[in-house]
């Protein structure tokens, strides 16, 4: 590479070191179907080895949002990689798809190999947990686009599901039950408001909250639901699923419901993590609005027939997932969600 390019602000050698540092982490994620991985112009994946009759590919992309600012300010970068994967694979999981592979995009002011390695380690940890191959990525050094120390992370996930097993909500009916899977905390949404409230409160993020440092609570990575939900799908007919992200209950649960139906949710049927109480009190936020911003303790929902509820809860418990019967489906022409207890 020419000296002129390096003089323009791009550190080629730092990029090489970052690639070398991340390689061992990436190798941990490989699946037998991967033909070509990092290093080529395009990564390849052999769908014929999936033993599916009529595979449907499902793709999704997402970022981590301004949660990144907290991670950057406090030098904790590995959990952000987990968030990047979780936001993507949890989304495509709602169709019943098994995640197959993942690609990342990291853009930064200046490549710091140690930081890039931490991010990719987190990505790889999440990929290993969800059996998702990290088969490609891009690290872009753009000094004029970002302030010193800043970076952004985005992810891209592709999965597959048998055409006959595709979950689209079309089988949702009155009387079916909504099961909520517990979140790990705030996950990766609402952080513009979270950061505003942190700044207004003037709290010491190193101080303890609920027996943990505040910063650890705020940076707790998004929960990965792939393993427990796929295990559930093998045993129980799932009618619809939702990943509770930006917009909370109000914007996400209706996305999987046919017209004319609503999910009637009892907000007293599951515990709300204490951090949401802190946020609500700090911002003097109406309870109804909280459910329109945050996951409030439920990060993912599945809808099943009433006869399958006990079995579903048992399977999820065996997968070490806290789950609750949080509501049921009713006929409603005017709204797609009814929240009780707010």
Swiss-Prot record:
Pfam families: AIRS, AIRS_C. It catalyses: 2-formamido-N(1)-(5-O-phospho-beta-D-ribosyl)acetamidine + ATP = 5-amino-1-(5-phospho-beta-D-ribosyl)imidazole + ADP + phosphate + H(+). CDD domains: PurM. Its EC number is 6.3.3.1. One of its GO terms (cellular component) is cytosol. Pathway: Purine metabolism; IMP biosynthesis via de novo pathway; 5-amino-1-(5-phospho-D-ribosyl)imidazole from N(2)-formyl-N(1)-(5-phospho-D-ribosyl)glycinamide: step 2/2. It is an enzyme of class 6 (ligase). One of its GO terms (molecular function) is phosphoribosylformylglycinamidine cyclo-ligase activity. Belongs to the AIR synthase family. PANTHER family: TRIFUNCTIONAL PURINE BIOSYNTHETIC PROTEIN ADENOSINE-3, TRIFUNCTIONAL PURINE BIOSYNTHETIC PROTEIN ADENOSINE-3-RELATED. This is Phosphoribosylformylglycinamidine cyclo-ligase. The gene is purM.
């Amino acid at each position: 590479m020419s000296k002129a390019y390096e003089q323009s602000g791009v550190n080629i050698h730092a990029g090489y070191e970052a690639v070398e540092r991340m390689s061992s982490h990436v190798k941990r994620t490989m699946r037998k179907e991967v033909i070509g991985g990092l290093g080529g112009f395009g990564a390849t994946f052999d769908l014929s080895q999936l033993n599916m009759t009529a595979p449907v590919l499902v793709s999704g992309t997402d970022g981590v949002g301004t949660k990144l600012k907290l991670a950057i300010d406090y030098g904790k970068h590995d959990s952000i990689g987990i968030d990047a994967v979780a936001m993507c694979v949890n989304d495509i999981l709602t169709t019943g798809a098994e995640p197959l592979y993942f690609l990342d995009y990291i853009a930064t002011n200046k490549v710091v190999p140690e930081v890039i390695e931490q991010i990719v380690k987190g990505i790889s940890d999440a990929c290993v947990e969800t059996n998702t191959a990290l088969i490609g990525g891009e690290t872009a050094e753009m000094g004029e686009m970002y302030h010193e120390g800043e970076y952004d992370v985005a992810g891209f996930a592709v999965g597959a599901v048998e055409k006959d097993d595709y979950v689209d909500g079309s089988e949702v009916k009155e009387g079916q039950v909504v099961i909520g899977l517990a979140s790990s905390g705030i996950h990766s949404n609402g952080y513009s408001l979270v950061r505003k409230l942190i700044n207004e409160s003037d709290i010491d993020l190193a101080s303890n909250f609920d027996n943990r440092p505040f910063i650890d609570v705020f940076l707790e990575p998004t929960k990965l639901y792939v393993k427990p939900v796929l295990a559930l799908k093998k045993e129980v007919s799932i009618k619809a699923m939702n990943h509770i992200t930006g917009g909370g209950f109000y914007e996400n649960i209706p996305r999987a419901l046919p017209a004319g139906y609503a999910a009637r949710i009892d907000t007293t049927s599951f515990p709300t993590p204490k951090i949401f109480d802190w946020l609500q009190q700090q911002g003097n936020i109406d309870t109804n609005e909280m459910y329109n911003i945050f996951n409030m303790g439920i990060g993912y929902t599945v809808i099943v027939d009433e006869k399958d509820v006990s079995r579903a809860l048992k399977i999820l418990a065996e997968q070490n997932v806290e789950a609750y019967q949080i509501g049921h489906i009713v006929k409603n022409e005017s709204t797609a969600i009814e929240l009780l207890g707010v």
